[in-house]
Amino acid sequence: SGITVTRVQVDNSLFSGPDFAPGWDPADIFGGDIAPIQAVMVDAGRTQPTTDESRRSTTPALDAGRALAAALRVDPATVSFASSPPTGQQLASVQSAPLIERLRQMMLASDNVMAETIGREVAKATGRPQSFAGAVDAVTGKLASSGVDMTGASLVDSSGLSVLDRLTAKNLDEVVGAAAGPNLPAMRPLLDLLPIAGGSGTLSDRFLAGDARTSSAGWLRAKTGSLTAINSLAGVVTDA
């Protein structure tokens, strides 16, 4: 209030390293599967924020700055990048939704961009660089230190989108088993985040065939994984 904004500059320096992982296909940006992973984004880089499967932007940080500039009645064409000064006056701030809610949205929408940015939060929390490598090391390191066998895992990103990623079926089984088992209660919330067959997320229209005695709808919680010519599913089924 009482302050006239004359220019908008975006500090995009929080994340380090490249913003596009090895093994990603640039065409996936236009398919809505991924965006360059930049520290400043609006709606995970979607060009149509109300549509989960919207194509993504190739310049999400710049777009975020331009959106702010337009809201402040500053010419969006003048937006530039700069590092924040060590001191300065805070004019406004915004807080993200709680982590558990962002994890839920990530799982239900199978949102690769959210997976990458949350991976960088884990990296920061464990003292690692907020980069692709730092996030992978943080996530796999935390699982391994908790007793989850990650032997054979070789990842270059946190979302699993890269064609260079390698996980074994045993890795996935170990993660789900740890969440369902009695020894790692901190992982139990993972089960609640998994989509429900015939009910939510990427399983909302699957496992609907059969009658009430044979259908998996409502009984299966699982996470899908899909790449070209590759499909996987890992989860739990409630039995009688």
Spans of model-derived segments:
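A small/polar active-site loop signature that marks catalytic segments
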Residues: 31, 36, 42-188
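Noncatalytic linker/hinge segments flanking ATPase motor cores
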Residues: 10, 47-57, 196, 216-219
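C-terminal soluble interaction/assembly domains
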Residues: 154-240
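Short Gly/Pro-enriched turn/cap motifs at secondary-structure boundaries
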Residues: 29-31, 58, 222-227
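Periplasmic/cell-envelope proteins involved in peptidoglycan metabolism and beta-lactam response
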Residues: 1-38
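Generic structural signal for residues positioned in beta-strands
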Residues: 7-9, 39-41, 105, 117, ...
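Intrinsically disordered, low-complexity boundary segments flanking structured domains
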Residues: 25-29, 141, 206-209
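Solvent-exposed coil/turn segments that connect beta secondary-structure elements
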Residues: 11-15, 45-47, 199, 239
